[in-house]
Amino acid sequence: MTAYEMNFDGLVGPTHNYGGLSYGNVASQSNSQAISNPKEAAKQGLAKMKALMDMGFKQGVLAPQERPDVAALRRLGFTGSDPEVIARAAREAMPLLVASCSASSMWTANACTVSPSADTADARVHFTAANLNCKFHRSIEHPTTSRVLQAMFASQEHFAHHPALPAVSQFGDEGAANHTRFCKSYGEPGVEFFVYGRSAFDSRYPAPARYPARQTLEASQAVARLHGLSEEGVVYAQQNPAVIDQGVFHNDVIAVGNGEVLFYHQDAFLDTDKVLGELGSKLAGRGGNFQAVCVPNSAVSVEDAVKSYLFNSQLLTRADGSMLLVVPEECRNNASVWRYLEQLTAGNGPIREVRVFDLKQSMQNGGGPACLRLRVALKEQELAAVNPGVVMSLELHDRLVAWVDKHYRDRLSEADLADPQLLIECRTALDELTQILKLGSVYPFQMT
């Protein structure tokens, strides 16, 4: 049966700012307090979506969250009218206002974990919203994320939605950023690869010392159970704690997989040989031929991998079966990374082409091409059941660019977040967006 991988990119929200909220994310920390350009950020993301659509890839869009999140501030004790809540938070607890304004939902790789119908017990596509409980600014996303996903994938015949796991550190879940699926073809049963940073309940597992491990083994196992995955179709691997301490806060900063190929750094995992062996044997059991492409430390250091976001790239299968790697501009600007990529594409391995995109506004907050997209493998009838309002087309692209031009600022500082007019601008924009994308009422301000 014909099936496709569809990428749903996050539309950058109108409050995109550099709050430096993500401890363990080097770019986020180092660009804290810089002036952001929400209009440019949204257009850079839309340009990538259009370019991939023009290349023949299936492309969709995922709506941003309502920000500032006044309801979250109310839960923290701020009272009064909505503008009064924002003014009081700005006066008494600016870091909380900054967190409530974060546009981090643009990184839809963290929205949820997706298992395609070929892998699940009930032959439906399963979604589990990620609790993102490691960071306050992201932990408030999942209720709206769930509503948006249900509006996009509404058919109960084809799609199953699970709420986020319990919001405690033992079940810390960062979604698809720590999940990859290998398969011979998208419509056939595959092997789902879950990467975790630590175990919550077994102290024998090592853990990083400097930065937090955001994903637990127990969270990954729970998602696999919820999705009805068989043991033959799942591999768990522990991320190398040493690279977490070097700024590799998600697996998608040090590895990317697609089809039968895993592109990874030499230091990405613990027990690498065992992990690769299990992936190879389980994929062979499902008719596939696993190919591992290892980038050695001698070619690209972990530091350069993190600076350039070499692995936070999109690995896409072209019509002829070869693969395309979509990387940020920062890869071209890093001598050792670019030298490696030129050698990689000149060889006779599976990755034959590299495409470079300018995603500077997202990159400065620590999110590259892979962060910005959620992959969903869909069979023909499932694709037909997706809400057509979120499927990218030339008409939708142009409409969204015009919408951004109409509603977004081209300069946003931390002080601007306290502007009561910003709240009105954002709600006006999102109200219009839900009509453009045919989502219905998904935002708290639309539901009161």
Swiss-Prot record:
UniProt cross-references to InterPro entries, sorted A to Z: AstB_sf, SuccinylArg_d-Hdrlase_AstB
Catalytic activity, EC: 3.5.3.23
Catalytic function, reaction form: N(2)-succinyl-L-arginine + 2 H2O + 2 H(+) = N(2)-succinyl-L-ornithine + 2 NH4(+) + CO2
Top-rank taxon: Bacteria
Binding residues for substrate: 19-28, 110, 137-138, 214, 252, 365
Top-tier EC class: hydrolase
Annotated GO biological process: arginine catabolic process to glutamate; arginine catabolic process to succinate
Record pathway: Amino-acid degradation; L-arginine degradation via AST pathway; L-glutamate and succinate from L-arginine: step 2/5
Keywords carried by this UniProt record: Arginine metabolism, Hydrolase
GO molecular function: N-succinylarginine dihydrolase activity
Keyword Lipoprotein among UniProt keywords: no
Active site: E174, H250, C371
Family (UniProt): Belongs to the succinylarginine dihydrolase family.
PANTHER family with a match to the protein in the record: N-SUCCINYLARGININE DIHYDROLASE
Function, in words: Catalyzes the hydrolysis of N(2)-succinylarginine into N(2)-succinylornithine, ammonia and CO(2).
Quaternary structure (record): Homodimer.
Family matches, as NCBIfam families: arg_catab_astB, PRK13281.1
Name the record gives this protein: N-succinylarginine dihydrolase
Organism: Ectopseudomonas mendocina (strain ymp) (Pseudomonas mendocina)
Upper taxonomic lineage: Bacteria, Pseudomonadati, Pseudomonadota, Gammaproteobacteria, Pseudomonadales
Gene: astB
